[in-house]
Design a protein with these regions (language model features):
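Hydrophobic transmembrane alpha-helices and their helix-loop junctions in integral membrane proteins
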Residues: 6-256, 267, 273
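Hard-cation-handling environments
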Residues: 240, 250-314
């Protein structure tokens, strides 16, 4: 009985692990997680409302939802859960790396989205409580990231569809509503206490430290880099000196664009506090665990350390981008910066690992189809045609030929009979 039970448990664990890895692969493609993240940067060619709704709030985060809703499977496999957490930790750092290197305001936000979803995926791999935090951050992130994507669209509207942050500067003076609403999203994403991001993302960092120091430190480093590149975005876009092109006359967007920004800015600040006291209980039936409630201004040791790291990131972003900002992106030979500008060579890796082998395989299959499959089909037709050409010569219309064939046939039959009797 015990032996059968052990076999059942092993089989359950094996299948759960396999299913967990397959679901994780699907989630990586859906939510732009390493190594299937390259498409998200290219998707920034679409309109900013699409980015706000689909890339920040709904479609791209669906992979996180998939993993969380599959928690019953991951509960039976520590290996797959660990893989989810590792993918999330790597992605949150890679996304922050990309965001720190880009000059395009939308691609900075795309790298940021990739990084924040990495936080969600990390949380989803930390167990039931982490899964609840993943959904919590998914909701708050939808508000402040949609706010910033629409804010980027407002900046583009006011600057002639330009997305190069080196062509901006001092836009807070001519676009005050866009600036202040964007600033609310900025405060939320870096996790200033009291904002939505503080309640959701800082919970994830604390949960990561509970799981292990490695995950906690990686999440903490990501928080510092996030503060840096978002401060860089604010400095290059809204603060400092103006660097507008001569034919550009920045102006504030109309009310039809700023009113949604105001609504999302309010949610960016207050939604986390509003959901903090009930989100865990609400998600408990789906995730299997409650989330510990944290008071508005309660901050443990990890929270204090996180705030210090965030402040250091803010200071670094301010010091490195407050003076002598050029009108064009400066050239660099820094390998880290170059890699970030090239999306950490995601497209190149895909070309080597997927595209070229895929073309080689497709060429081999096409050659097999031409030479073997078509060869058999066409060969059978050719043989049939050749045989018919031979046989048709027998039917030549001459009686003497038919008589000869009859004689030959009788002789052959006679030989067969005689030889058969002799045998």
């Amino acid at each position: 009985s015990r032996g059968l039970g052990d076999v059942y448990k092993r089989q359950t664990s094996t299948w759960a692990t396999l299913l967990g890895f397959m679901l994780l692969l699907a989630a990586c493609g859906k939510s732009a997680q390493v190594p299937l993240q390259a498409w998200l940067l290219d998707a920034m060619e679409g309109p900013t409302p699409v980015s706000a709704l689909i890339h920040a709030a709904t479609m791209v985060t669906a992979g996180v939802y998939l993993v969380v809703r599959s928690h019953e499977i991951y509960a039976h496999t520590g290996a797959a859960s660990l893989a989810v957490a590792i993918i999330g930790a790597v992605t949150l750092l890679f996304g922050a790396w990309i965001g720190s290197a880009k000059k395009d305001i939308k691609k900075v936000l795309a790298g940021s989205t990739m990084s924040q979803i990495g936080y969600m995926m990390l949380a989803a791999g930390l167990g039931p409580a982490g899964a609840a935090l993943a959904i919590f951050h998914l909701l708050t992130h939808g508000f402040f990231k949609a706010n910033m994507f629409l804010g980027a669209g407002s900046v583009m509207h006011g600057t002639g569809d330009d997305t190069d942050m080196y062509h901006f500067g001092a836009l807070s003076k001519v676009m005050p509503m866009t600036f202040w609403t964007f600033a609310c999203g900025y405060l939320a994403i870096i996790g200033i206490p009291g904002t939505s991001g503080y309640f959701s993302k800082d919970h994830i960092i604390e949960a990561a430290f509970d799981k292990g120091a490695v995950f906690g430190v990686l999440a903490l480093i990501g928080a510092g880099i996030t503060a840096y590149y978002m401060t860089r975005l604010m400095m290059l876009t809204f603060l400092g000196t103006k660097r507008w092109r001569a034919d550009v006359h920045p102006h504030e967007s109309p009310a039809v664009m700023t009113i949604p920004l105001i609504v999302l800015a309010v949610l960016s600040i207050f939604a986390g506090a509003f959901m903090n006291n009930w989100i865990g209980d609400w998600l408990a039936p789906a995730t299997g665990a409650e989330v510990e409630h944290v008071g508005m201004w309660h901050m443990g040791v990890i929270g204090v350390v996180t705030l210090v790291v965030v402040i250091l990131g803010i200071v670094a972003g301010w010091l490195l981008n407050r003076h002598n900002v050029p009108n064009e992106e400066p050239e660099t030979h820094d390998p880290l910066l170059v890699a970030g500008r090239h999306d950490i060579y995601g497209d190149d890796i895909n070309d080597v690992v997927v595209v070229k082998p895929g073309r080689w395989l497709a060429g081999g299959v096409a050659g097999f189809d031409r030479s073997v499959v078509d060869g058999l089909v066409n060969g059978a037709g050719s043989v049939t045609t050749a045989c018919s050409q031979i046989i048709r010569k027998v039917q030549n219309g001459y009686v003497r030929s038919y008589g000869l064939m009859m004689v030959v046939g009788v002789v052959v039959v006679g030989l067969v009979v005689v030889l058969g009797r002799m045998a």
